[in-house]
Design a protein with these regions (language model features):
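Conserved PLP cofactor-binding pocket of PLP-dependent enzymes
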Residues: 85
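N-terminal accessory segments
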Residues: 1-48, 77-80
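N-terminal glycine-rich flavin-associated loop
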Residues: 25, 51-82, 100, 106-148, ...
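Short glycine-biased active-site loop of nucleotidyltransferases that positions the nucleotide triphosphate
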Residues: 48-51, 93-98
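Beta-rich nucleic-acid/ligand-interaction surfaces
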Residues: 153-155
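Short clusters of hydrophobic/aromatic residues that line enzyme substrate/ligand-binding pockets
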Residues: 34, 41-44, 91, 112, ...
Length: 164
C-alpha cells in the first residue's frame, strides 16, 4: 500500500532531506562547490528539454575525483538520489534532476589528457566540450563532431550518457 502525503507533508519532508543533504555535503565540499538556494539552482532545473523542470535539493560542483566519491558516499548514506550532469544540452531529459535528490555537476572535469593520432584516440575527462576535442585533434588532421550544431557547448560525458 502506498501512503499519500499532503502537499505540506511533502514540503516538510523535502526541507528535512535538503537540510540533511546540505549538512553532509558541506562536510565534503568547499563552500563554493555547493549550491542550494532557488535562485542559484534554477539553471539546473532542466537540460535542453525545457518543457519539464524540477528543482534539485542541491547542486554539487566537485573539482576532484575524491570529491565526487565523497558526494556519492554521503548521498548514498542518506538515501538521497544523485543525477549526474554535464553541460545540460541534451534534449531527452537525461539530466533531469530528482526533486528529492542532488544534481552532481561534472562540468569542472574538462581536461584533455592525451590525443594519440596514431591510434586515433583521445583520453579526456567527462566535462570536455566536443569542440575542444576537435580543436586539440585538428593539428593531426582529426576531428570529433557527432553533432556539429551543439559542439561548442555539449560535453563528451553527455555524449556517452545520452548515446549521442
Amino acid at each position: 500500500m502506498t501512503a499519500l502525503l499532503s502537499v505540506k507533508q511533502r514540503e516538510r519532508l523535502g526541507d528535512e532531506r535538503q537540510s540533511q543533504a546540505i549538512a553532509a555535503l558541506r562536510d565534503v565540499l568547499p563552500e563554493h562547490a555547493l549550491i542550494w538556494n532557488a535562485e542559484d539552482t534554477t539553471p539546473y532545473e532542466c537540460d535542453g528539454l525545457t518543457a519539464y523542470r524540477t528543482r534539485p535539493l542541491a547542486v554539487a560542483l566537485p573539482e576532484t575525483e575524491a570529491q565526487v566519491a565523497a558526494v556519492l558516499k554521503s548521498c548514498h548514506a542518506l538515501g538521497v538520489p544523485v543525477v549526474a550532469r554535464g553541460a545540460g544540452t541534451g534534449l531527452s531529459g537525461g539530466a533531469m534532476p530528482h526533486p528529492m535528490g542532488v544534481t552532481l555537476s561534472l562540468a569542472k572535469f574538462n581536461r584533455i589528457l592525451k590525443i594519440d593520432p596514431v591510434s586515433r584516440t583521445a583520453v579526456v575527462q567527462c566535462g570536455v566540450r566536443n569542440l575542444a576535442i576537435s580543436e586539440a585533434a585538428a593539428p593531426f588532421g582529426l576531428y570529433y563532431a557527432p553533432d556539429p550544431s551543439s559542439q561548442i557547448a555539449c560535453t563528451i560525458g553527455g555524449n556517452v550518457a545520452e548515446n549521442s
